């Protein structure tokens, strides 16, 4: 009989967010303040749902029917992305790949590279980066500590590395790389001949000119970086599923292979494309009315993050992030562990948050709050928290 | 710099269907009779598009908004599948996993198993089975010849094998396994402790009671088989994207691991779920009005397959399949090679078909016609073909 790929046994039993669901399952869900998983809570603007319905109705007529779409995504969407997100940046529509979500894309892309590659990830980090590399049998993983003393920004790796995962604005810490910070990493990758996986899932939350939205704003990044973007957080597509990645044609492996070419081969074999009506919904995000509607929602989330951040500070918590990000990284009090603080929040304040240690060892002593919640939930959470004595 | 995963260099340059697109690109597309890639051509029934639009509109209201869905798919759809497709078969909703397409599911599932596993595939076969195993570094691939003399049904492997890919009704040959044929394989898998990947993408085309729709109709198959199904061909979802797989909890690896448990871990890490409105569209396929509408479309495709099959026979071609399948497997005349016949059909008869040799060595000398075309296209194709002198 077939044997298991033993690399799978090296994973934790459960994916982090399911462990949290399990623990929360003992409470009445409706009375809990969910500041846990980063899922959207504001309705999707009508301008977007209309675009999806209108595209769906095209399929009920033979003359406008569409079957299999291009595995790379429809040109209309790739052009809209290029024209709106990569103005004055040397990225062409042919370097954009539309997909079903960053999780799927970023966890599969590593398959293209040699199994003995050295990988650098931040600690704490989004668990998918590490888990997908463990599943692929990679053992050479360098964890880059992101600590209070370095402002939660990683320091450059000590060893030679081949693949570097960077997420900015960061999940879970909410901290964003400035242009200067990011340039240091692009220069390092060039010098080291390393490839950066740049996860920009939260770029819509950036509020300062000093923080780049795209890694390609840094000169030369198109020789060393692949960028991931999503409609999940910017447009509420967590349940609709649409994302994209940017893979410049200039990218070559050390052994001289075009990464673009092999990635195309990879998706042609392993990927059936993204739902057509959903791609039309994503396209609508770039029209004037689409942009306005999304901006209204983003502003509500931003206000929520501000309220949560300031509320926590007024309760004497030390907090980070929450400015360019929907996430607030909060230090526990009295050196309480992340999971103890999680249990306390759940039992005494009816709050779900995500224990920092779930994102890596260096996350111990912290908890992640998500501001994807309505104002009332955040207010209730802060009121409940005020009553908790530590 | 990161090096390429060298297993990728063992693949053909282009995925088969893109090579065909390239060759067809020199012709005016509108005047070609496309009997090539198996893509639907009939409009999607309104009852389905309505379900998708109605679910989409739920998302524009906060009280009916849904964000991230369960990675395994919504219970409403898994229950509908179980109640309609697995009546009197010991499969529970918890053993069903909703996904974006069989291609993605079947190409990823092999990741769960040991890299040195022995794989058996039919020759000819759907290229994704082989390519995904090559990408994973598997070198022990046994090709099972499916030839005219064995009715295009594979004979049992000579060596010990761990993973067996079976597609019935078959792509590309259009031939279906009877209950007796399939039982032989289930028994073999049991004896050998092998795991069967059973691709049932075309089960909706089965017209005889003698041909099982599900491998689990064979007693004991739930100990040795994973089944893949899709809404692509049965309901026209090629552009909408929805499929599912059935993974019984009884399945264990030789080393005693629960495949269900590790697959759940796999998708939790690597998969963000299927679009909610599309899952509602799929659910609607199982209502009375949904079933009727789909049956109408299927009957049109079936008539097309019959017309094409009979037309080819009347032109003295030797054909197989086309009864339980939208595909007709046609022998070339005068021992012409598959690609020569492809070029001839393209240049002299304005027909696109798929060269049999593209599906494997044993496909040489054959061509695959798809009956996913309207009646007029099939008529024109047959008329054009009649004029071709060989």
Question: Which functions belong to the PLM regions below?
Answer:
Chain A
Residues 27, 136, 191-192, 315, ...:
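Helix C-cap/helix->beta junction micro-motif
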Residues 279, 283, 298-309, 319-331, ...:
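Conserved glycine-rich beta-strand-loop-beta hairpin in the small C-terminal domain of fold type I
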Residues 218-299, 306, 310, 388:
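Conserved core segment of the aminotransferase class I/II
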Residues 20, 35, 52, 81, ...:
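Generic structural signal for small/hydrophobic residues in well-ordered secondary structure
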Residues 63-189, 203-218:
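Conserved core of the PLP fold type I
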Residues 3-101, 108, 285-288, 390:
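N-terminal small-domain helix-loop-helix segment of the aminotransferase-like
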Residues 43, 301-302, 315-348:
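Conserved PLP-binding catalytic core of the aspartate aminotransferase-like
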Residues 90, 335, 344-354, 358-390:
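PLP-dependent enzyme catalytic core of the Aspartate aminotransferase-like
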């Amino acid at each position: 009989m077939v044997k298991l790929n033993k690399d799978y046994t090296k994973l934790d039993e459960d994916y982090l967010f399911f462990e949290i669901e399990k623990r929360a399952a003992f409470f009445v869900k409706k009375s809990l303040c969910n500041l846990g998983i980063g899922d959207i809570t504001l309705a999707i603007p009508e301008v977007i749902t209309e675009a999806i319905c209108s595209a769906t109705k095209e399929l009920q007529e033979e003359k406008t029917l569409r079957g299999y779409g291009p595995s790379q995504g429809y040109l209309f969407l790739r052009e809209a992305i290029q024209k709106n997100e990569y103005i004055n940046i040397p990225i062409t529509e042919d370097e954009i790949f539309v997909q079903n979500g960053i999780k799927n894309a970023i966890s599969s892309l590593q398959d293209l590279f040699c199994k003995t590659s050295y990988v650098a990830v931040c600690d704490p980090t989004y668990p998918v980066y590490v888990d997908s590399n463990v599943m692929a049998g990679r053992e050479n993983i360098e964890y880059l500590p992101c600590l209070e003393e370095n402002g939660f920004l990683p320091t450059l790796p000590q060893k030679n590395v081949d693949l570097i995962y960077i997420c900015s604005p960061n999940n879970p810490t909410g901290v964003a790389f400035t242009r200067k910070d990011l340039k240091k990493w692009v220069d390092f990758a060039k010098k080291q001949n390393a490839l950066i996986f740049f996860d920009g899932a939260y770029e819509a939350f950036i509020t300062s000119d000093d923080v780049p939205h795209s890694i390609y704003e840094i000169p030369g990044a198109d020789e060393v970086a692949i960028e991931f973007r999503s409609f999940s957080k910017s447009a509420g597509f967590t349940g609709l599923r649409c994302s994209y990645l940017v893979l410049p044609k200039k990218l070559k492996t050390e052994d001289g292979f075009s990464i673009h070419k092999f990635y195309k081969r990879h998706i042609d074999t392993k990927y059936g494309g993204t739902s057509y009506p959903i791609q039309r919904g994503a396209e609508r995000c770039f029209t004037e009315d689409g942009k306005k509607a999304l901006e209204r929602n983003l502003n509500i989330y931003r206000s929520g993050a501000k309220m949560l951040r300031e509320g926590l500070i007024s309760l004497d918590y030390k907090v980070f992030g929450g400015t360019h990000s929907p996430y607030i990284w909060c230090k526990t009090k009295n050196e309480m562990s992340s999971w103890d603080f999680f249990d306390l929040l759940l039992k005494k304040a009816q709050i779900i948050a995500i224990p920092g240690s779930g994102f890596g060892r260096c996350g111990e002593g912290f908890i992640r709050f998500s501001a994807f919640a309505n104002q009332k939930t955040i207010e209730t959470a802060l009121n409940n928290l005020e009553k908790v004595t530590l």
